[in-house]
C-alpha cells in the first residue's frame, strides 16, 4: 500500500517541505534512496545510507517548534525496519512526518549557511531584552524598549523616547540622557557606555530605569522661529509655521493712573522731538521708547517692580541677556520679559518664547525648593516701540511650557489720536503687572500654611503675623 510522507531537511522551514510516495511495506533504507533521488542537488555528495530519518509529527501551524526542536525524544527510523513499523496507518494530513538529517561532515554549503543564520538569529534573540523606561519629569507611566544590548545606540534610545513621549527637550541639538536605576546613576556619552550600562542592568536583573533629559542651552539670539516651533511642538503639520500657530492671548487692560499716562505722553513727545523714531531706527533708539512704556506701567505700582535692562538669565534651552526684565521686588522673581526688535517680529517672538520658559523654569526650581505648589505665569512683550505683541507662558502638570500670543497693538506717532493708542498699550502693561503679582497673593500663602500643617509642622507666630499683615 502506497503512502505519502511529507519530509523536511533539518534546518529548513515548513515552506521547504517536500512529499515522497512509497510503499509502506518497503524498508526505511528504501525510503532513504527515494529521498536522495527526490533531492539530487541537496544530497549530491551524500550516500543514501548516511541519511538519518526521524519521525517528527509537526503540524503546519507549529513552525515555531522547528526553532527549538530536540531529537532526543524522537524516533529514529532504522534502515532495516519496514516503513509500516513507524506508519501503520495513514499519516496525518498537513503535518511533517519525517525529518531528514544529513551527515554533519557532508552537509551542503546551503544547509550550513542556513544553520549559521539560524544560530546567529537565536543568539540575537537571546541578547534582546525588554526594558521598562520612564521619562522624567512627572511621567509615572513608562513604556517597553526591546533592544539587543550589544547593538543598542544612544540615537536609537532617543528616537524611541521621541516616538513614545515626544518630549520637547529631545529636539534640542546635543540633548544628554541621564539614566537612573537601582544600580546607580549613569550618563552614557557614547554607544559603548550605553551597552555596558544595559549589560549591568541585565546582570543585576533590574530592567527598569528612568531617563532625565538635559539640554545644553544656547544663546537666545541663536533660536529661529521654526526651531522654536519644533522645540515646543507648535508647528503641527506645517513645515513653514507662522505666528498663527500660537494660541491667541486675550491680554486684559487696566486703566492706568492719570499721572503715569501724562508722564508717559510727555516723555514720548520729548523723545520724538530729540530722538525721532522711524523704520530705519536701530534697536537702541527703539529701546529708549520701550523703556518709557515699561517705566510708566511700573509707576502704577510704586516700589513693587524693578526694571532691569540686560539682565542675564539661563534656562533649559537658552541663555543670555534680556533687553528688559521686570522683577517683582518682594520675591526678586522675573515676571516680565521684553524683547525689542528693529523689525523682525517673527524672530522676536521665537526668542521671547525661550526667554519666558527660561524665566519660568528658574521660578519653578525656587518654588520646588520652598515646597510651593504653584509658581504662576510669566509675561512677555515683543515690540519695535510701534507695534506691540503680548505673550503669556505657563507650565502644565508635566512641566511642559505652553504659550499664548496676542494680536498686535500699533502706535502711530504721527497720528492725532496718539494718546489713545499709547493709553491702550499702557493699559495692557498695567494689567500684566497686576496679574504678575497674583502668585504671591494671600490665597497662595494660605495654601502654603495648610501644606505645612498637614506635613506636621505648626505655623509659627511670625508666619501668622505675616499672613495678617
UniProtKB/Swiss-Prot annotation:
Glycosylation sites: 68, 126, 181, 248
Signal peptide: 1-17
Region spans: LQLFLAK-like domain: 18-57
Family: Belongs to the Crinkler effector family.
Keywords: Glycoprotein, Host nucleus, Secreted, Signal
Principal cellular location given in the protein's record: secreted
Annotated domain remarks: The CRN proteins have modular architectures that include a signal peptide, a conserved N-terminus, and highly diverse C-terminal domains. The conserved CRN N-terminus harbors a distinct LXLFLAK motif, which is followed by the conserved DWL domain. A highly conserved HVLVXXP motif marks the end of the CRN N-terminal domains and forms a junction where diverse C-terminal domains are fused.
Protein name (Swiss-Prot/TrEMBL): Crinkler effector protein 1
Gene that this sequence comes from: CRN1
Record organism: Rhizophagus irregularis (strain DAOM 181602 / DAOM 197198 / MUCL 43194) (Arbuscular mycorrhizal fungus)
Amino acid at each position: 500500500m502506497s503512502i505519502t510522507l511529507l519530509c523536511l531537511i533539518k534546518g529548513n522551514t515548513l515552506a521547504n517541505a517536500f512529499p515522497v510516495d512509497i510503499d509502506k511495506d518497503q524498508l526505511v533504507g528504501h525510503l532513504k534512496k527515494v529521498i536522495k533521488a527526490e533531492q539530487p542537488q541537496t544530497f549530491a555528495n551524500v550516500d543514501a545510507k548516511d541519511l538519518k530519518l526521524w519521525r517528527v509529527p509537526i503540524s503546519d501551524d507549529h513552525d515555531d517548534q522547528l526553532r527549538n526542536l530536540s531529537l532526543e525524544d524522537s524516533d529514529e527510523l532504522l534502515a532495516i525496519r519496514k516503513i509500516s513499523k513507524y506508519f501503520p496507518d495513514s499519516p496525518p494530513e498537513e503535518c511533517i512526518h519525517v525529518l531528514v538529517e544529513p551527515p554533519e561532515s557532508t552537509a551542503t554549503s546551503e544547509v550550513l549557511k542556513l544553520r549559521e543564520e539560524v544560530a546567529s538569529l537565536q543568539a540575537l534573540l537571546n541578547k534582546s531584552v525588554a526594558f521598562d523606561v520612564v521619562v522624567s519629569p512627572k511621567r509615572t507611566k513608562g513604556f517597553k524598549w526591546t533592544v539587543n544590548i550589544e547593538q543598542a545606540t544612544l540615537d536609537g534610545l532617543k528616537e524611541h523616547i521621541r516616538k513614545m513621549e515626544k518630549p520637547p527637550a529631545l529636539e534640542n541639538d546635543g540633548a544628554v540622557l541621564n539614566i537612573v536605576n537601582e544600580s546607580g546613576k549613569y550618563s552614557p556619552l557614547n554607544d559603548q557606555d550605553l551597552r555596558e550600562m544595559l549589560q549591568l542592568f541585565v546582570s543585576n536583573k533590574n530592567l527598569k530605569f528612568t531617563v532625565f533629559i538635559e539640554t545644553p542651552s544656547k544663546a537666545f539670539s541663536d533660536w529661529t522661529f521654526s526651531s522654536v516651533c519644533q522645540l515646543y511642538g507648535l508647528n503641527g503639520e506645517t513645515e513653514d509655521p507662522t505666528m498663527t500657530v500660537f494660541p491667541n492671548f486675550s491680554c486684559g487692560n487696566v486703566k492706568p493712573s492719570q499721572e503715569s499716562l501724562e508722564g508717559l505722553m510727555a516723555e514720548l513727545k520729548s523723545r520724538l522731538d530729540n530722538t525721532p523714531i522711524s523704520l530705519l531706527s536701530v534697536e537702541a533708539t527703539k529701546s529708549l521708547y520701550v523703556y518709557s512704556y515699561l517705566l510708566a506701567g511700573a509707576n502704577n505700582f510704586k516700589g513693587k517692580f524693578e526694571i532691569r535692562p540686560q539682565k542675564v538669565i539661563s534656562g533649559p534651552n537658552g541663555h543670555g541677556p534680556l533687553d528688559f526684565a521686570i522683577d517683582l521686588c518682594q520675591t526678586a522673581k522675573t515676571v516680565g520679559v521684553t524683547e525689542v526688535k528693529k523689525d523682525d517680529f517673527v524672530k522676536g517672538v521665537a526668542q521671547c518664547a525661550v526667554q519666558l520658559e527660561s524665566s519660568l523654569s528658574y521660578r519653578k526650581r525656587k518654588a520646588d525648593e520652598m515646597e510651593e505648589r504653584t509658581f504662576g505665569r510669566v509675561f512677555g512683550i515683543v515690540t519695535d516701540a510701534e507695534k506691540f505683541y503680548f505673550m503669556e507662558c505657563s507650565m502644565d502638570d508635566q512641566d511642559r511650557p505652553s504659550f499664548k500670543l496676542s494680536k498686535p497693538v500699533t502706535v502711530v506717532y504721527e497720528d492725532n489720536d496718539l494718546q489713545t493708542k499709547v493709553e491702550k498699550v499702557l493699559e495692557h502693561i498695567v494689567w500684566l503687572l497686576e496679574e504678575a503679582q497674583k502668585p504671591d497673593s494671600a490665597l497662595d500663602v494660605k495654601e502654603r500654611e495648610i501644606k505645612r500643617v498637614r506635613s506636621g509642622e505648626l505655623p509659627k507666630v511670625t508666619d501668622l503675623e505675616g499672613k495678617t499683615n
